Amino acid sequence: MDSESESESNPSTTDEFDRFLDAPDEFYYDCLPIRSNSHQPSSLLRRRKSAHRRDLISSDIETEPSSSSDGFDVGEKSSYVEKNAELRGDIDTSDVIESTKDSIDLSSEKENDLDVISSSGNDMDVIDSGRNRVDPFQEESTVTTVSSDDQGDDDYAGSVPQFREPPNSTEWSLLGFLVGLVIKAIEFQVSFMTSLLTFPPWLLRNCFLFFFDPFSTIRFGRRFLMARVAGISDMIFGYMNPFRLKDTKQMLSIVCKFGWGMFWAVYVGIVLFGLLVSSLMIGGYVINRIADKPFEVKETLNFDYTKNSPEAYVPISSCAGVECEGSCKESNEMSKIRGLRVIPRDQKLDIILSMTLPESAYNKNLGMFQVRVDFLSVDGQTIASIRRPCMLRFRSEPIRLVQTFFKVVPLVTGYVSEIQTLSLKLKGFVEKDIPTACLKIIIEQRAEFRPGAGIPELYDASLSVESGLPFFRKIIWKWRKTLFVWISMSLFITELLFTLVCCRPLIIPRTQPRDRSPSNPTGVWR
């Protein structure tokens, strides 16, 4: 009675309580004070408070004898006011506990969540027991709320918040592209090596087939070529969109663009080829001017054994005046070659004389003999002379017998002969003011022998003359090919840069812009 009198005396308070109790759940969540510095999630706090409020409502439903879906009595409202006051007190205490328990682990939170779930299960039992007294709409809404809360508690109890950065799709795509490119390169190398190994047997087999059965081989080759051409054509037309083939104008424009592009490609190739050829020609001319070729002469010697000391001549420019020995008049040929210098001045001459002698008893008994080389001028005068003694290499009789035993088969068959080759190196001559026109090689006679004796027996002889270049000229001559490549490439790059800077339209065609900017609406080149 007192509560009824109070509600009648204070109608505004009763209306406020009605609005407060009839408000949805979100209203209670928004009214609850939540501290921002709490380490616990806000969803956990909201579930705890909603579960506590549901416990109060379920205990109310058990104590009341009857319920109506239309509303509540004044006594029920006063009891809910008391429960609401208790709820606010619990909220304040929970905030205080929350601010003081920052060091508590998540395990305690999970235990509390399990308690909340069990309490929510009790709510479901209470609602099921009083199903005859509760409105169907209210029952459905209550069960839905509890089930959703249980699902939220289970989700939170089984999951831990993880902070992961989203993967960068661009980096992953680039990495995948690089990996695929490496795999394709390896596949190409393996297939290429396999083709190199299988191609020779395949070619040999086809050659044998063509030799034994040419007509079937020709038919097989024709089918193979037709299959390859068909595969290439299918690949080309597969890349083309078949719907574009229906538009004749668009196809003609594509063909025209392709032809125009091929024309400009051929034109640019011709220009670049011309620049390359010109650079190669200029590089060759420069190398020919700066690189001096050393003088080289190789001649076979024919000694004149009619003389007491056999002699032979090797012409450098001419040996026309060697018979005069400075006593005969100058001929027209001598006057022509007098001012001709073949070997550059102040260059050394390296002479190598090779003689092949038989291992005869005469040569072994002869022992030492001497070779002389005279440098003659145009009129036959001797400019300089070089002498070198030589002899056969000595081998004792036991060594000779052992070598003959091991070489008996080649000696009998004629693959090996009993000969020795002597190589004499004659150095020390430097070209002076008077140019050298001829060389005279003389085998000098031994002093203790009578005339015509004391001369070795020869199979053949040859002479090699080479002039020595200075140090830097020698380096240029040895590296002339490398210098030619570097000079030609440098000239080509220089010509290309000059053409791009000064004659740009000759090598790069002028193209029209596809998109016209607002500042240049007419598309006119500036």
UniProtKB/Swiss-Prot annotation:
GO terms for cellular component: endoplasmic reticulum; endoplasmic reticulum membrane. This is Seipin-2. It is a multi-pass membrane protein. It comes from the Eukaryota. It comes from Arabidopsis thaliana. Residues 58-70 have a biased composition (Low complexity). It is found in: Endoplasmic reticulum membrane. InterPro entries: Seipin (IPR009617). Belongs to the seipin family. GO terms for biological process: lipid droplet formation; lipid droplet organization; lipid metabolic process; pollen germination; regulation of double fertilization forming a zygote and endosperm; seed dormancy process. Residues 33-77 are annotated as: Disordered. Keywords: Endoplasmic reticulum, Lipid metabolism, Membrane, Transmembrane, Transmembrane helix. The chain crosses the membrane at residues 195-215, 224-243, 258-278, 483-503. The keyword Transmembrane helix applies. PANTHER family: BERNARDINELLI-SEIP CONGENITAL LIPODYSTROPHY 2 HOMOLOG BSCL2 PROTEIN, SEIPIN. Expressed in seeds, seedlings, leaves, stems and roots. Not detected in flowers. CDD domains: Seipin_BSCL2_like (cd23995). Involved in lipid metabolism and lipid droplet (LD) morphology, number, and size. Supports the formation of small-sized LDs and modulates triacylglycerol accumulation. Induces probably a reorganization of the endoplasmic reticulum into LD-forming domains.
